């Protein structure tokens, strides 16, 4: 199934630096929708609220966690589609994102607060179309913050992957129920 850009669901993930959580969420959602044959129905991106990592590639542990865990989450064919993960370049969230995306998912309360501050001063807030919420509101068992694994070890990245994957499976169920 193919959708023109007008009918695509446009999803943006936002964390602090755009090298760990939001990048991981972008990768996971791309994998899930590719595996279901609906990648063309989505426009998926990620950004950070800070400027710390603009232009940087994903944290190597993000890439490693996705490579280790995606195989059990998506089809082998879809996994081949993601050899370009390290080509991602971090970018900063901008006020234009409010009018470009249908869904803007913050990884935690701090990210959500920063997004709302940008919205308050946005020159595009009158054209604001996005639903803004924490991705963790889609968690199966309880609403969570997707914790930043940056200062942790691989186990923290794998926990992050599991939370992101769980939330996105539930988000897709909601999207499918609306169609």
UniProtKB/Swiss-Prot annotation:
Protein family (similarity comment): Belongs to the low molecular weight phosphotyrosine protein phosphatase family.
Pfam family, one: LMWPc
Major localization listed first in the record, in broad terms: cytoplasm
Catalytic activity from the UniProt record: O-phospho-L-tyrosyl-[protein] + H2O = L-tyrosyl-[protein] + phosphate; a phosphate monoester + H2O = an alcohol + phosphate
Domain of life: Eukaryota
Active site, renumbered: 15, 21, 148
Subcellular location: Cytoplasm
GO CC, alphabetical: cytoplasm
GO molecular function: acid phosphatase activity; phosphatase activity; protein tyrosine phosphatase activity
Protein source organism: Dictyostelium discoideum (Social amoeba)
EC number: 3.1.3.48, 3.1.3.2
Protein name: Low molecular weight phosphotyrosine protein phosphatase
Keywords, sorted A to Z: Cytoplasm, Hydrolase, Protein phosphatase
Record-linked InterPro entries: LMW_PTPase (IPR050438), Ptyr_pPase (IPR023485), Ptyr_pPase_sf (IPR036196), Tyr_phospatase_low_mol_wt (IPR017867)
Disulfide bridge map: none
Function: Acts on tyrosine phosphorylated proteins, low-MW aryl phosphates and natural and synthetic acyl phosphates.
């Amino acid at each position: 199934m193919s959708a023109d850009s007008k009918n695509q669901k446009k999803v943006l993930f936002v964390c602090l630096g755009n090298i760990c959580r939001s990048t991981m969420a972008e990768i996971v959602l791309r994998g899930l929708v590719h595996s279901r044959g609906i990648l063309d129905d989505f426009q998926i991106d990620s950004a950070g609220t800070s400027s710390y990592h603009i232009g940087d590639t994903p944290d190597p542990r993000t890439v490693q966690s996705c490579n280790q865990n995606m195989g059990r989450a998506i089809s082998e064919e879809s996994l081949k589609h993601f050899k370009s993960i390290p080509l991602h370049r971090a970018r900063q969230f901008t006020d234009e994102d409010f009018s470009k995306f249908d869904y803007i998912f913050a990884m935690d309360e701090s990210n959500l607060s920063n997004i709302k501050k940008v919205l308050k001063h946005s020159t595009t807030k009158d054209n604001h179309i996005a639903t803004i919420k924490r991705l963790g509101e889609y968690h199966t068992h309880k609403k969570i913050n997707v914790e930043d694994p940056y200062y942790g070890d691989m186990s923290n990245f794998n926990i992050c992957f599991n939370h992101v994957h769980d939330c996105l499976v539930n988000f897709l169920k909601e999207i499918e129920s609306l169609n």
